[in-house]
């Protein structure tokens, strides 16, 4: 079988960040009866479901550690490796940090797919690492029933510049650096519904590096930051609100969307992860049409950064984004929490 004819997505039951275990199930898995080990230098653990762990070295610098891997979301091996690596490195940028090295995680069905195809996957990962200015310094591989690839990434950040997902404030405006709809468009492609003019759009977005996050971290008015991945905009925004004790009002029309995404949702191109996300976070939403719900719950792979920004810092954030070719528009705002109101309201 040639590398050009291979369709990697046929060899896995899930795709990209849509492979994630649902938040409700994950909570059961992570629940522990053991006494919590307390380390005062661990600035960010898993209590707030943040993007990465952060450890204070005590010298003004903190280490960021993260890992992310998944099954193919595209058929091309090189693109799969590049997307998986870009997605993993994004967690460092989402914490406001700078990546310094990565190691690869590879699961490969050696009796089904050739090592040459696996090499193309790792080459895609290596390419993304070079884009981020880091080495792919090693890794680990196993014989697995389905192809899996990703990275464990280490980064650094000035301790005072760490950006968490739980430190937003009422009054902050919300910004999203990439359009939604990655799960929808990749599902439309699998269902042979994708129009020629939309071919490759999702791949291009997934391969965009969230490198701007390190620059956003230098802006005092950026109060919180996270990347939007497998739990969709609703999930990651809900976690931001829960961590800060605020509620969100979102302007649906202002949300950046991939071309054709609303049409494909109406045609049924909705990934399975969408329903899992709604089952976990739907009780936090206000009333809205099914099509809106399906987009907000759409699992993103290598999605954009979600920023909570004080109004006085809006112009600086937009100017910084423009330096990276990103045009930002506010998609909503955070307001004080009030009982009896949905955590995320759509206008």
UniProtKB/Swiss-Prot annotation:
Effect of residue 87 to A: Complete loss of activity
The UniProt record lists the keyword Membrane: no
Keywords for this protein: ATP-binding, Kinase, Magnesium, Metal-binding, Nucleotide-binding, Selenium, Transferase
Self-association and partners: Homodimer.
Source organism (scientific name): Escherichia coli (strain K12)
Binding site for ATP: 20, 48-50, 68, 91, 139-141
Annotated GO CC locations: cytoplasm; cytosol
Cofactor binding, per record: Binds 1 Mg(2+) ion per monomer.
Gene Ontology biological-process entries: selenocysteine biosynthetic process; tRNA seleno-modification
Cofactor(s) the record lists: Mg(2+)
Active site: residue positions: 17
Coiled coil (UniProt feature): none
Recorded consequence of changing residue 91 to A: Complete loss of activity
Record InterPro entries: PurM-like_C_dom, PurM-like_C_sf, PurM-like_N, PurM-like_N_sf, SelD_I, SPS/SelD
Protein family (similarity comment): Belongs to the selenophosphate synthase 1 family. Class I subfamily.
Variant or mutagenesis effect after changing residue 18 to V: Partial loss of activity
CDD domains according to UniProt: SelD
Site (Important for catalytic activity) residue list: 20
NCBIfam families attached to this UniProt entry: PRK00943.1 (NF002098), selD (TIGR00476)
Catalytic activity as recorded in UniProt: hydrogenselenide + ATP + H2O = selenophosphate + AMP + phosphate + 2 H(+)
Name by which UniProt lists this protein: Selenide, water dikinase
Residues engaged in binding Mg(2+): 51, 91, 227
Enzyme class: transferase
GO molecular function, one term: ATP binding
Gene that produces this protein: selD
Function comment: Synthesizes selenophosphate from selenide and ATP.
Mutagenesis or variant effect for residue 51 to A: Complete loss of activity
């Amino acid at each position: 079988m040639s590398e050009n004819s291979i369709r990697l997505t046929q060899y896995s039951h899930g795709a990209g960040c849509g492979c994630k275990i649902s938040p409700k199930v994950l909570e059961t898995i992570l629940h522990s009866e053991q006494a919590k080990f307390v380390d005062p230098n661990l600035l960010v653990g898993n209590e707030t479901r943040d993007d990465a762990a952060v450890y204070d070295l005590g010298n003004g610098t903190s280490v960021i550690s993260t890992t992310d891997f998944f099954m193919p979301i595209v058929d091309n091996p090189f693109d799969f490796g590049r997307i998986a690596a870009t997605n993993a490195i994004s967690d460092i940028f989402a914490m406001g940090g700078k990546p310094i090295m990565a190691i690869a995680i590879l699961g490969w069905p050696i009796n089904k797919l050739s090592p040459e195809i696996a090499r193309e996957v790792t080459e895609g990962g290596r390419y993304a690492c070079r884009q981020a200015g880091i080495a792919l310094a090693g890794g680990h591989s196993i014989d697995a029933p389905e192809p899996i690839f990703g990275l464990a990434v280490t980064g650094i950040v000035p301790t005072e510049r760490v950006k968490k997902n739980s430190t937003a404030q009422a009054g902050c405006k919300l910004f999203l650096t990439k359009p939604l709809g990655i799960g929808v468009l990749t599902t439309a492609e699998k269902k042979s519904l994708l129009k020629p003019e939309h071919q490759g759009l999702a791949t291009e977005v997934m391969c965009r590096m969230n490198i701007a996050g390190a620059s956003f971290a230098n802006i005092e008015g950026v109060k919180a930051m996270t990347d939007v991945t497998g739990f969709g905009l609703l999930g990651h925004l809900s976690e931001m609100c829960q961590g800060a004790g605020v509620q969100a009002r979102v302007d649906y029309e202002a949300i950046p969307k991939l071309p054709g995404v609303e049409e494909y949702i109406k045609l049924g191109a909705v990934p399975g992860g969408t329903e899992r996300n709604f089952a976990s976070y739907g009780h936090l939403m206000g009333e809205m049409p099914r099509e809106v719900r399906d987009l907000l719950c759409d699992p993103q792979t290598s999605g954009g950064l979600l920023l909570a920004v004080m109004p006085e810092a809006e112009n600086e954030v937009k100017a910084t984004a423009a330096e990276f070719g990103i045009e930002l528009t506010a998609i909503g705002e955070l307001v004080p929490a009030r009982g009896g109101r949905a955590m995320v309201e759509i206008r």
